[in-house]
Amino acid sequence: MAHPNEEIARSATEAISKGDMEGFLSFHTDDTVVHFPGRGPMAGDHRGKDGVAKMFQQQMQLLDAPPEIENHDIVAGDDHTVVLNKTRATRGGKMLEQNQVVVMHIEGGKIAEVWLHFSDQQAMDELASS
């Protein structure tokens, strides 16, 4: 039987792929924090549901469509869940495909903090900044 935090991570990831901001935010605590690495326009610590919503909206404005996320594995425990996936994002007709590691801290059935790690951070920064 899968750990309940695995389903939270899977559902949150599916919401991103559908461009469903409300669905995505429903899996987060009110004081959630998303750490987006790099030097691109989305880089930084996005705090609270309002901050994460702004990041999500910015992502939707930058990309031609919501990113396609293919989860390879989800390892869930009581406090942390790790998602290994392949992400495809397109901007201006240019597609970037790369592996991603997402670490989530989950409290009381909600995502409290997220750390994103891209296999090619420079390519991600270039896509977001082009």
Which residues fall in each region the model found?
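A short hydrophobic beta-strand element
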Residues: G77-T87
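Short, surface-exposed coil-to-beta transition loops
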Residues: E68-I69, L96-V102
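Short, cysteine-centered beta-strand-loop-beta hairpins and adjacent loop/turn segments enriched
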Residues: D64, A89-E97
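Short, low-complexity N-terminal intrinsically disordered segments enriched in polar/charged residues
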Residues: M1-D30, K110, D125-S130
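Short beta-strand edge/turn micro-motifs at domain boundaries
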Residues: V103-D125
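A short, polar/proline- and glycine-enriched secondary-structure boundary/capping micro-motif
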Residues: D45, G93-L96, Q122-A128
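A solvent-exposed, acidic/Ser-Thr-rich amphipathic alpha-helical stretch
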Residues: L25, T29-D79
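Hydrophobic beta-strand positions in extracellular immunoglobulin-like domains
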Residues: T87-A89, I106
